[in-house]
UniProtKB/Swiss-Prot annotation:
Component of the lipopolysaccharide transport and assembly complex. Interacts with LptE and LptA. It comes from Xylella fastidiosa (strain Temecula1 / ATCC 700964). This is LPS-assembly protein LptD. InterPro entries: LipoPS_assembly_LptD (IPR020889), LptD (IPR050218), LptD_C (IPR007543). PANTHER family: LPS-ASSEMBLY PROTEIN (PTHR30189), LPS-ASSEMBLY PROTEIN LPTD (PTHR30189:SF1).
Length: 792
């Protein structure tokens, strides 16, 4: 039994290493899946990580048509095949020297394992000294599109050198781009390669010369230059950033982002990441000295991280700061902790969770980032907030629970601003003083969930107790006590029935359900005019509002109620596929008495009678067409308060068309609050070309909010996107124009501005998988910023 020839692992790591430069965006191989232009072994096994890991312990089998020579120098000829695990080596002839451990393999030398396929003319070397030479190599990565050639490979142990090597993810017969290097050194011990005098070619044209560059060949990170980011916008002019990655240690690194903006000057942006067993954190800071457009120094800072204290407790922090209220608009920063365009939230706290409880101690602070507003637009700072929630099922029909928190509220004074003749906003000198206070809110409850095979009845008895200790200033504004108290019971009864039947519609078999639901709520009236409004507003009326025990988001108001919700949902489920083709829901609240509690005097009281009708429709016409609609009809004023219609059509495997109409009425004065249309698409013109666009228009303001138009050319190894964008950049309606051009060399990297974030936000379904992410609201706003463990 002879040792297996070590022809592959080191030299072909060059090929794998080049593909390791791949961008982190999801590659799209849909137009031309990975093919194997080189002939492989028919008996090659599939990818099995257990076989790969056990290679050194497996025996090597050698066979051929003939065996001649001597015991010292056996010669295998004719269809020679050496096999070990997933590794196969074939040649026309293999001569070995058992004393010196040398070998020569000639004629149609082929090597294949679960990750790569290699064809060469000749291989020779010495197993004892671990010196090898392979001539005229062609290689193909299996499962990825990487392929290329090399004139020769010299191996000395774990160090190797290739000569006249190429790499591309295109088909070998139609290589649109290719990376070529006359010399590449590879060090498997250190995990990096060095290419000298490398040339990046597009077609037959060299477009980039790199006299020397270093790159990783495995998952270990290496210090070096990342690919540049280029762009142009009306705000900044020509925009160039050159990221520099610093691999400082296995568990922490840094990235520098020197950036030049034609209209503003130079900016330095830095990011530092730290990872350890019990947590991780990252920080980012930017500074631009003497911004030429604002004539002042500007900057930002952010920090985000967590530390696992034990199995139940975790410390988390999310901090963000900008130097001025125009920073967000000018630099479109994606700060950690960014919650809106008008403000930034910083949060720090300790949070715990158990089988039946959650608890935490946290504090936050808000910073104004919109120059057209004053601090009155900010939420109250919670400094601190202590909360404890408990939910314990005792029996199948008995459940106890508790919601509780104590919060100290603070707020910055508001410095009023006014629009000047030159279009700038300046402070007027007027100041609105803000005062705070401390609030304790406790809500214990007991629930009795009775259920049957097709019904449920759940009575719930709760009590809400809220007490305050207010600053004297806010108590005087409310003409009340500094220590107001509110205490009241909350009683609800939630019940429903599930009915179904078999039915046939247009020859298709369906399971049709009828799901009526009844929700009764009783809360007695308590005068709450002496209570402040720290963190409480009215919920937007929707389907979910039909079944809440309060129509307000916070504890500062608890509405009185004597009401009954009547609602029903009906579904049509295809019995062959199990898919829900149609769902209809409609509901309304019956008010048995006037509701006297309001947020303020301007809020209209709910009168005895009927609420707005709420209806939702979801219709999956087929696998391509989807229709959704929400409609609210106010029977008291005989008007529609809200309407939303959304249609989606899927084209092929990648294309999509979205149509939407949104209308909302201001329920306080009956005026139209929002009226918009939204049309977006990714339309495949042919297998290579596709058009992209969005037209987002305000019918109320009679102006577009965002216009996007572009073309993209997509092949198996290259994508080119050109995007023209005009969008509203601030609350005052100022527009900005930009041109974005991106070249995506699939399996390598991209050059230009990152168009993905803009297109994924503007065109829901630009990446088809985004349609199925949860929650969709996070996806449509900013997919890359979605945090499933967001700090409460």
């Amino acid at each position: 039994m002879y040792r297996v020839l070590r022809l592959l692992p080191l030299p072909l790591s060059v090929a794998i290493s080049l593909s390791a430069l791949a961008d982190e965006k999801p590659p799209n191989w849909g137009l031309c899946p990975a093919t194997l232009p080189l002939q492989g072994f028919e008996q090659a096994p599939g990818m099995d990580k257990h076989v790969v890991q056990s290679r050194p312990q497996l025996p090597t089998n050698i066979e051929g048509d003939t065996l001649t020579g001597t015991a010292r120098t056996p010669l295998y000829q004719g269809n020679v095949l050496m096999a070990r695990g997933d590794q196969l080596l074939g040649a026309d002839s293999v001569r070995m020297d058992t004393e010196t451990d040398s070998y020569v393999a000639e004629g149609h030398v082929r090597y294949q394992d679960s990750s790569i396929l290699v064809v060469a003319d000749r291989a020779e070397g010495n197993q004892d000294t671990d010196v090898h030479k392979i001539s005229n190599i062609q290689y193909q990565l299996i499962g990825r599109r990487g392929n290329g050639v090399a004139k020769s490979v010299d191996i000395h142990g774990q160090v190797g050198q290739t000569h006249e090597a190429t790499y591309t993810t295109c088909d070998p017969s139609q290589a649109i781009w290719r990376l070529r290097a006359p010399e590449i050194d590879v060090d498997n011990v250190e995990g990096f390669g060095v290419a000298r005098h490398a040339v990046f070619e597009v077609g037959q044209w060299p477009v980039l010369y790199l006299p020397w560059f270093k790159f990783p060949i495995d998952s270990r990170r290496q210090t070096g230059l990342l690919y540049p980011q280029l762009g142009y916008s009306g705000r900044n002019g020509f925009d160039y950033a050159q990221p520099i990655y610093l691999n400082l240690a296995p568990n922490y690194d840094a990235t520098l982002y020197p950036r030049y903006m034609q209209k503003r000057g130079f900016m330095i942006d830095t990011e530092f990441r730290y990872l350890y067993d019990d947590g991780k954190w990252q920080t980012r800071a930017a500074f631009i000295p003497n911004d030429q457009l604002r004539d002042k120094d500007r900057g930002r800072f952010s920090f985000n991280g967590y530390h696992n204290i034990d199995n139940h407790w975790q410390a988390r922090a999310s901090l963000a700061w900008v130097s001025d209220t125009r920073y967000m608009e000018d630099f479109s920063s994606r700060l950690v902790g960014m919650s809106s365009l008008s403000s930034l939230q910083s949060t720090v706290g300790v949070y715990g969770t158990g089988e039946t409880w959650t608890a935490g101690l946290m504090a936050d602070r808000w910073q104004l980032t919109d120059y057209s507003l004053n601090e009155s637009a900010l939420a109250y700072n919670r400094q601190p907030r202590l909360f404890f929630n408990w939910d314990k099922p005792v029996l199948d029909f008995l459940e106890f629970g508790l919601y509780s928190e104590v919060v100290r509220f603070k707020h910055d004074d508001a410095y009023l601003v006014a629009l000047q003749n030159d279009g700038n906003y300046l402070r007027t000198g007027e100041v609105i003083r803000y005062y705070g206070g401390t609030r304790l809110d406790v809500k214990p409850y007991v629930s009795l969930p009775f259920t049957g095979a097709s019904w449920y009845v759940t009575p719930t008895f709760g009590w809400r107790y809220s007490s305050y200790y207010l600053d004297s200033g806010i108590a005087e504004q409310l003409n009340g006590s500094r220590t107001p108290v509110r205490s009241l019971p909350i009683v609800s009864l939630d019940s429903g029935v599930y009915l179904d039947r078999d039915t046939t519609v247009f020859g298709r078999n369906y399971l049709n359900t009828l799901e009526p639901r009844f929700y009764y709520l009783y809360v007695p009236y308590r005068n709450q005019s002496d209570l402040p409004l720290f963190d409480t507003r009215a919920f937007t009326f929707s389907w979910g509002q039909l079944f809440r025990d309060s129509r307000y988001t916070g504890p500062d108001r608890q509405n009185d109620a004597n009401q009954l919700t009547l609602a029903v949902t009906s579904r049509w489920l295809d019995q062959n596929t199990g898919k829900e083709d149609l769902a209809l829901s409609v509901g309304q609240i019956l008010y048995f008495k006037d509701s006297l509690v309001t947020l303020s005097d301007s809020e209209e009281r709910i009168q005895k009678g009927k609420s707005v009708w709420v209806s939702d429709v979801a219709y999956n016409v087929n696998d391509r067409w989807t229709l959704n609609a929400t409609y609210q009809w106010n029977p008291n004023f005989r008007r529609d308060d809200l309407a939303s219609v959304r249609a989606r059509y899927l084209i092929g495997s990648d294309g999509i068309i979205n149509l939407a109409y949104r209308y909302r009425r201001n329920t306080l004065d009956g005026t139209t609050q929002l009226k918009q249309t939204d049309f977006s698409f990714l339309y495949p013109i042919n297998p290579r070309w596709s058009a992209i666009g969005r037209y987002y228009y305000s019918l109320l303001d009679k102006k577009p909010l965002e216009i996007i138009g572009g073309l993209q050319w997509d092949s198996c190894c290259l994508a080119v996107r050109t995007v023209l964008r005009r969008h509203m950049r601030d609350r005052t309606g100022n527009m900005d124009n930009s041109i974005q051009l991106e070249f995506v060399f699939k399996g390598l990297s991209s050059v230009g501005q990152d168009t993905d974030r803009v297109l994924r936000r503007a065109i829901l379904g630009y990446y088809r998988d985004d349609l199925y992410l949860v929650p969709p609201s996070n996806t449509t706003t900013d997919p890359d910023a979605y945090d499933p463990n967001k700090i409460p």
